Regions:
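Short, structured beta-strand/loop micro-motifs enriched in basic residues and often containing a Trp
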Residues: 152-159, 283-287
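His/acidic/aromatic-lined binding-pocket segments of jelly-roll/cupin-type domains
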Residues: 93, 102, 124-127, 165-166, ...
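Transition-metal
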Residues: 1-145, 205-233, 257
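Short acidic-glycine-tyrosine-enriched beta hairpin
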Residues: 163-175, 291-308
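C-terminal amphipathic alpha-helical segment
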Residues: 201-273
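An exposed, glycine/acidic-rich loop-and-rim segment of catalytic or binding clefts
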Residues: 156-162, 173-175, 180-232
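Short beta-strand segments in beta-sandwich/barrel cores
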Residues: 267-268, 284-289, 302
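Ligand-binding loop in jelly-roll beta-barrel domains
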Residues: 86-88, 96-101, 110, 131-134, ...
Length: 328
């Protein structure tokens, strides 16, 4: 029998990151393998230098994402994307468990990031997987604010008074363009989809200290130039989830994200799309069937569908919830 060396849906080994604010939900809910009780992030799919995801299934197991792009180029990521980004995988996918408040922070846009750090900027979105009853996020300012007001509040330890706190529950979606001040608060679990960048300007960190008694570095000056000081109106993305249909969530220059809720087989045809597709499975499990491949996907797994695959069947075992992400 002829060996099939064509591309197929790829699963990856999660890259688990200990954080000062991390917890145990990622191992409890999503079976992430770790002895640590401080896992804040699982980098599900990353081409970020030094943190490249490694394939865990099929004949390509053991190869990392950058090596695959080098070999398969546009067949893996899409011709247009390969032309623009080369060997850089343009997006980063994470699961984040805030067992304590994250620092209040902001990310630079592409232009500033390129100039200062030779990096992509960071526009991102959050899908709230779960939240404790009092779970909230910080998203921008309550009212329009001047640089002077902001600096004074920072100096007087009352920045919190200026910021917009948004109560959240399971299923809420927040879009965070570069420049928007934000933070995940204690008790919130999110899926994060972002540009492939690890640039964070930390504005305030509650005077927390690390194991050596040192406070983490703040980036007050760097942040000042990139902050959007306008009031945040309605930070939540409005959407009506439909079963056995595609529900659009976010569409921006960097990524398009849809919600798929299904309890019967659905067929997704990507023949007109010049992009890879990523599935983040948040609830249930299902089989991806395409060409000569059948791949089981469990809750908490992330899968890369290569751009060369035009059509996939998603066969659920009960109810399934997943995020579908690509670049248009």
């Amino acid at each position: 029998m002829k060996e099939d060396n064509s591309l197929y849906p790829l699963k990856f080994q999660p890259i688990l990151k200990e954080k000062i604010w991390g917890g145990t939900k990622l191992k409890k809910l999503f079976n992430k393998q770790t002895d640590s009780d401080k896992i804040g992030e699982s980098w599900e799919l990353s081409g970020f230098k030094g943190d490249e995801s490694v394939v865990s299934n099929g004949f390509l197991a053991g190869n990392n994402l950058t090596e695959l792009i080098e070999i398969y180029m546009g067949d893996l990521v899409g011709d247009k994307i390969f032309e623009e980004f080369g060997l850089t995988f343009p997006l980063l996918f994470k699961l984040i468990d805030a067992n304590d408040d994250l620092s209040i922070q902001v990310h630079p846009d592409d232009e500033t990031a390129a100039l200062r750090h030779n990096s992509l900027g960071k526009t991102e979105m959050w899908y709230v997987i779960d939240a404790e009853p009092d779970g909230e996020l910080i998203v921008g300012f309550k009212n329009d604010c001047s640089r002077e007001e902001y600096l004074k509040a920072l100096e007087e330890e009352r920045l919190s008074d200026l910021l917009k706190k948004v109560p959240v529950r399971k299923g809420d979606v927040i879009f965070i363009p570069a420049g928007l001040v934000h933070a995940i608060k204690k008790g919130v679990l999110v899926a994060e989809i972002q540009e492939s960048s690890d640039l964070t300007y930390r504005i305030y960190d509650y005077k927390r200290t690390d194991e050596h008694g040192k406070e983490r570095e703040l980036h007050t000056e760097l942040a000042l130039d990139v902050i959007n000081f306008s009031a945040t109106k309605n930070p939540k993305v409005a959407y009506e989830p439909k079963v056995n249909a595609v529900t659009p969530l976010v569409s921006c220059d960097y990524f398009t994200t849809n919600l798929l809720l299904f309890n019967r087989t659905i067929i997704r045809n990507y023949s007109s799309l010049d992009s890879f597709v990523v599935y983040m499975c948040l609830e249930g499990n299902f089989i991806i069937e395409c060409e000569n491949h059948k791949i089981l996907v469990e809750k908490g797994e992330t899968v890369l569908i290569p751009a060369s695959l035009d059509e996939v069947s998603l066969i659920p075992n009960g109810e399934v919830k997943l995020l579908e992400v690509f670049i248009q």
